[in-house]
Amino acid sequence: MLIGVGTDIVQIPRIEKILNLYQELFAKKILTSQELKQFTLLDKPNHATFLAKRFAAKEAVSKAFGVGIGQGINFKNITIINDNLGKPVVEVSSHYTNKLIPFHIHLSLSDDYPICIAFAIVESNCSV
């Protein structure tokens, strides 16, 4: 059963400006420790795109839950990792998921400078 759909678009140059001002403080604000490990392994020119995609993905996922970032869920509650084929996989912290019925999240990410987009679908694992 469909719980919700969310999407978000981010201008990569906007993230570049934020990185120039705040450097890695911004990354530490929106990335989980697992994502930060990935981030630090990237070449510096790829930092803005990585952050833009994670920002868009987390916004899209929060919108699919119907709450938005800061309204019961925050950036640190959502981790975006990639499987062996590069597919984005979403993990939501147990602090948040304990309040919900079992669910599965589908996420699609795409970027074509200067834009990146995320599209998320949340569905319940329960049959009605």
Swiss-Prot record:
GO terms for cellular component: cytoplasm. GO terms for molecular function: holo-[acyl-carrier-protein] synthase activity; magnesium ion binding. Transfers the 4'-phosphopantetheine moiety from coenzyme A to a Ser of acyl-carrier-protein. It catalyses: apo-[ACP] + CoA = holo-[ACP] + adenosine 3',5'-bisphosphate + H(+). GO terms for biological process: fatty acid biosynthetic process. Belongs to the P-Pant transferase superfamily. AcpS family. It comes from Rickettsia typhi (strain ATCC VR-144 / Wilmington). It holds the Pfam family ACPS. This is Holo-[acyl-carrier-protein] synthase. Keywords: Cytoplasm, Fatty acid biosynthesis, Fatty acid metabolism, Lipid biosynthesis, Lipid metabolism, Magnesium, Metal-binding, Transferase. The gene is acpS. It is found in: Cytoplasm. SUPFAM superfamilies: 4'-phosphopantetheinyl transferase. It comes from the Bacteria. InterPro entries: 4-PPantetheinyl_Trfase_dom (IPR008278), 4-PPantetheinyl_Trfase_dom_sf (IPR037143), ACPS (IPR002582), Ppantetheine-prot_Trfase_dom (IPR004568). Its EC number is 2.7.8.7. Mg(2+) binds at residues 8, 59.
